[in-house]
């Protein structure tokens, strides 16, 4: 017979004596994690906790994003595109978490934020080393972006390593070259620290792949995964800009930037320019013979 409503008895096998065992809190180090939300406003402002958690959770998702993009790069280096497609599916969900959670911060009104904004000092999202790592992994290389991290040698060193290494897009072009596609040598071996310069020859490589997708299915699928990734990244940038505009208008950013104006310029940046340009070059396929 069913038991009383709103009551669920513990099953006999559920462990309740946790002395000497690894617990949920132990495994996740919740004592450290949950003690990291330290407000600075005096007296503590109710909404400062929201602001801190918004950014800390973003950093956690970016840590996972870096982990997954690194795995993608290793698969591409090994000429194994297919296993990377599953990772891209996960990357898609991580990115959605990142840009959809801006809606939580948007519940912060301008006057509420102004009541504790001064406690941020000169801190700014531009100083997020993990965000910078994601940009480097995807190919947006800018030596000036390393400057805010010079005072932390370990972080600066890791970012410098990514800055000097081929990006995901670079590795994909190198893979296509190994597969026999006529990628220009200037895009197979170059100074990876320099900003990427798009090439009409690379557009032509992609045009051939798109015009005969069945013959180049893995490469075609990879092209679309990269476009998906960049589109979602642009959505993140846009939501960031709109959230800032909604909360502070056109005030200067805490880190010294112009604020919304600086964020708007990022919308013009492209990670994979030829994958966007090729869409203009595509023509209708020839009619298929029907028996």
Swiss-Prot record:
Keyword list, A-Z: Dioxygenase, Heme, Iron, Metal-binding, Oxidoreductase, Tryptophan catabolism
One Pfam family cited in the UniProt record for this chain: Trp_dioxygenase
E.C. no: 1.13.11.11
Signal sequence region: none
One annotated GO molecular function: tryptophan 2,3-dioxygenase activity
Chain sites annotated for binding substrate: 51-55, 113, 117, 254
Binding site for heme: 240
Swiss-Prot/TrEMBL cofactor(s): heme
Pathway: Amino-acid degradation; L-tryptophan degradation via kynurenine pathway; L-kynurenine from L-tryptophan: step 1/2
GO biological process: L-tryptophan catabolic process to acetyl-CoA; L-tryptophan catabolic process to kynurenine
Enzyme class name: oxidoreductase
Keyword Heme: yes
Bound cofactor: record note: Binds 1 heme group per subunit.
Catalysed reactions listed for this entry: L-tryptophan + O2 = N-formyl-L-kynurenine
Record family assignment: Belongs to the tryptophan 2,3-dioxygenase family.
Subunit organization: Homotetramer.
Function: Heme-dependent dioxygenase that catalyzes the oxidative cleavage of the L-tryptophan (L-Trp) pyrrole ring and converts L-tryptophan to N-formyl-L-kynurenine. Catalyzes the oxidative cleavage of the indole moiety.
Protein name (Swiss-Prot/TrEMBL): Tryptophan 2,3-dioxygenase
Gene: kynA
């Amino acid at each position: 017979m069913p038991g009383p409503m709103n009551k669920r008895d513990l099953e006999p096998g559920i462990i309740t004596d946790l002395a000497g065992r690894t617990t949920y809190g132990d495994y996740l180090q919740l004592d450290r994690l949950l003690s990291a939300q330290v407000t600075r406003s005096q007296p503590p402002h109710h909404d400062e906790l929201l602001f801190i958690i918004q950014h800390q959770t973003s950093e956690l998702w970016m840590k996972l994003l870096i982990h997954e993009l690194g795995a993608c790069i290793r698969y591409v280096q090994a000429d194994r595109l297919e296993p990377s497609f599953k990772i891209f599916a996960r990357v898609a969900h991580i990115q959605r978490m990142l840009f959809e959670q801006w809606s939580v911060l948007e519940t912060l009104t301008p006057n509420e934020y102004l009541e504790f904004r001064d406690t941020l000092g000169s801190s700014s999202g531009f100083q997020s080393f993990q965000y910078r790592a994601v940009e480097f992994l995807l190919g947006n290389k800018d030596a000036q972006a390393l400057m805010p991290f010079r005072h932390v040698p370990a972080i600066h060193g890791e970012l410098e390593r990514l800055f000097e290494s081929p990006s995901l897009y670079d590795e994909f072009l190198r893979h296509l070259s190994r597969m026999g596609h006529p990628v220009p040598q200037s895009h197979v071996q170059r100074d990876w620290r320099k900003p990427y310069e798009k090439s009409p020859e690379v557009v032509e490589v992609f045009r051939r792949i798109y015009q005969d997708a069945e013959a180049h299915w893995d490469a075609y699928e990879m092209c679309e995964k990269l476009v998906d990734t960049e589109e979602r990244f642009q959505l993140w940038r846009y939501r960031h800009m709109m959230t800032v505009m909604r909360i502070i208008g056109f005030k200067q950013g805490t880190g010294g930037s112009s604020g919304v104006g600086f964020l708007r310029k990022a919308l013009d940046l492209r990670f994979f320019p030829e994958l966007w340009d090729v869409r203009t070059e595509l023509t209708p396929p020839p009619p298929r013979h029907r028996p």
